[in-house]
Amino acid sequence: MPFCRLAQVLISVLLPFISVAQSQDSVRISLADAEQVFMQKNLSLLAQQYNVDISKALVQQAKYWDNPTLNTDQNIYDGKFFRHNSEFGQVYVQLQQVIKTAGKRNKLVQLAQDDVLSAQQQFSDMMRNLRFILRNDFSTLNLQFKTWRIYQSEIASLEKLSVGMDAQLQAGNISQKDNIRVKALLYNLQTDAASLQQSIADTEKEFAILLQTGGDTVFIPQREDSVNIHLSYSLGALLDTAKNNRPDVQLAQTNLLSQQHNLSYQKALATPDLTVGVEYDQRSSYINNFWGLGLSLPLPILNRNKGNIKAAETNIKQANVQVQQMQNTVQQEVIAAYRKLLSLQHLQQTVPQGFMEKYNLLLKNMVQSYQDRQVSLLEFIDFFDAYKEAATRQLQQQASLANAAEELNYTTGTTIISIK
């Protein structure tokens, strides 16, 4: 009796956690609706999009010429700055303009355009990663809620059985030991349900952050019980698709291209820029009212930008290695995702059609058979545990198959298999 009373106390403590979802606002949501909200409201994506806009603004900035420089000097000893009407007057004005040589301005514009392309690819890669997390969270929530329903169904059956056994115990038809074992089974199941509820809360938190939703809302994913996967691509086609579509591969290639453009720019910097100017000198030159044309350029004797050119050449070698590393990584990721999907597809095909429907009916019959004392308590408990294990494994297998398809989509950078 003390154990029975302890179990009842613990169950009463856990029940508020088990029923927590009922006190919150529940929203049924499809994967398509979740992705639409994600694309519109996710702040990480919005912030990354600003980087694209910033890079585009810097392209425009790179196109501008340097401002001209105005030089002048006047006398200040008597405060009469422009006494040019008298024999002592003096005015000196010089206007200069720097002219970029060796195509420096165009090369700088090209580097800025590379940065725009890089920012766009970073945005695409972030979206790819976040969408993968979103779809995995959706699949995880779907699995958790379906497992929750199995627990709730089993708990309801055991609670009904427990009430009947209490009456049978009072009538002396069953032993205290059998009654306690059923209550212990119920308690263990309720404990598992409470633990599952905490896992649901963690997944809901991450899902809500991705959707940027406020309030105490519980999202309930809407997905068909069975997931049909049809893969029509060969492994070679999948590898080519990943090479052409993955934004992180494109980003590595853009970095290599940008480093090549930077080398061209650094070589151009070794060519001196030309400064041209026009000047007027009223009285201090060899003649009054002197007009002159000025040209100046630094002599490339001490600094010919060799260090930066060498660094740019090394950056190209580094970028080449990074492209090769990225291509090898992508290849292995696609191969692993492909093999995983094939393995889970084969496992799914071994499950008989309508297996769980028959098992559910058998569970109801088993509960009734135990109430009618047609099976022993040990047989009932063994069957009950086996049913829970089989039902949850079936759900996990379906979720794993869906996740494997999502992983293949993720590793190839495009939707190879559409999952709703």
Description of each model-found segment:
Residues 8-17:
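Bacterial N-terminal signal peptides
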